[in-house]
C-alpha cells in the first residue's frame, strides 16, 4: 500500500526451479507464455501431494497445467490486485482490496483445501474458497479482457472509460459479447455482473 511498507525476508530464494526441494505449495505468479516451460521444469521438483495454485489470467490455465502435470493437485484460481512494479525489487500495491479466489481440485476430493485457506488468512491475505470457481475465473477474464479491449480502442485509462458515456457503452457491449461466449459453454454469469464489475473497477 502507498502508506505501508512490507519487507519480505524469505528463508530461501532462487531463480532456478530445480533448486526447490519438494514444496508443499507452489503459487504460480508468472505470465501465461511462460506456463509450459515452468510446469515442465516443475515435473522433477514437486512431490505427489504438492498443491499448485495458479494466479494467471486466462480460462484455460488449469487444463494447460494438467497437460504437463497430469497427476498434480491444482486449485484453479484468479486474483484481483491493483499493483505494479515500482522499481526492481519493489511492488507498489495501490489498493487494500486485493483478493485471491480459488476452488478445489475435483480430481482430488479427499484433500483438505481449507488448510490452504488458513495459510492465507494467517498471513492477512484475502483468500476465498468457492464451489463454482469456473464462474469466478470467467468473471475475471471478462473483466480484464473488456477493459483491455476498450482501453486499447480509445487509448485511455480505466478512469476515463468510467467517466465517459460513449466509452462506457462500448465497454458494456464487449462485456455482453464475452458473456455470450461463456453462456455457449454453459457458464452462466449473474444478470447484474456488469454493474458488479463497475463497482470493482472503481
Regions inferred by a protein language model and the residue ranges of each:
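Conserved N-terminal glycine-rich FAD pyrophosphate-binding loop of Rossmann-like flavoproteins
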Residues: 1
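Short, intrinsically disordered, charge-balanced linker/junction segments flanking boundaries
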Residues: 194-202
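Internal alpha-helical scaffold of NAD(P)-dependent oxidoreductase catalytic cores
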Residues: 45, 68-73, 88-192
Amino acid at each position: 500500500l502507498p502508506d505501508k511498507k512490507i519487507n519480505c525476508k524469505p528463508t530461501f530464494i532462487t531463480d532456478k526451479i530445480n533448486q526447490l526441494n519438494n514444496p508443499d505449495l507452489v503459487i504460480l505468479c508468472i505470465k501465461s507464455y511462460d506456463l509450459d516451460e515452468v510446469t515442465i521444469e516443475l515435473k522433477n521438483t514437486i512431490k505427489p501431494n504438492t498443491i499448485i495454485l495458479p494466479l494467471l489470467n486466462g480460462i484455460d490455465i488449469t487444463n494447460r497445467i494438467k497437460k504437463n502435470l497430469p497427476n498434480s493437485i491444482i486449485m484453479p484460481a484468479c486474483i484481483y490486485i491493483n499493483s505494479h512494479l515500482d522499481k526492481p525489487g519493489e511492488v507498489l500495491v495501490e489498493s487494500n482490496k486485493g483478493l485471491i479466489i480459488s476452488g478445489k481440485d475435483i480430481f482430488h476430493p479427499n484433500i483438505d483445501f481449507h488448510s490452504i485457506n488458513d495459510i492465507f488468512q494467517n498471513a492477512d491475505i484475502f483468500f476465498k474458497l468457492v464451489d463454482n470457481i469456473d464462474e469466478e475465473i470467467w468473471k475475471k477474464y471478462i473483466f480484464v479482457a473488456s477493459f483491455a479491449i476498450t482501453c486499447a480502442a480509445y487509448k485511455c485509462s480505466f478512469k476515463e472509460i468510467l467517466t465517459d458515456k460513449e466509452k462506457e457503452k462500448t465497454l458494456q457491449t464487449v462485456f455482453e459479447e464475452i458473456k455470450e461466449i461463456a453462456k455457449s459453454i454453459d457458464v452462466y454469469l449473474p444478470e447484474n455482473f456488469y454493474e458488479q464489475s463497475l463497482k470493482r473497477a472503481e
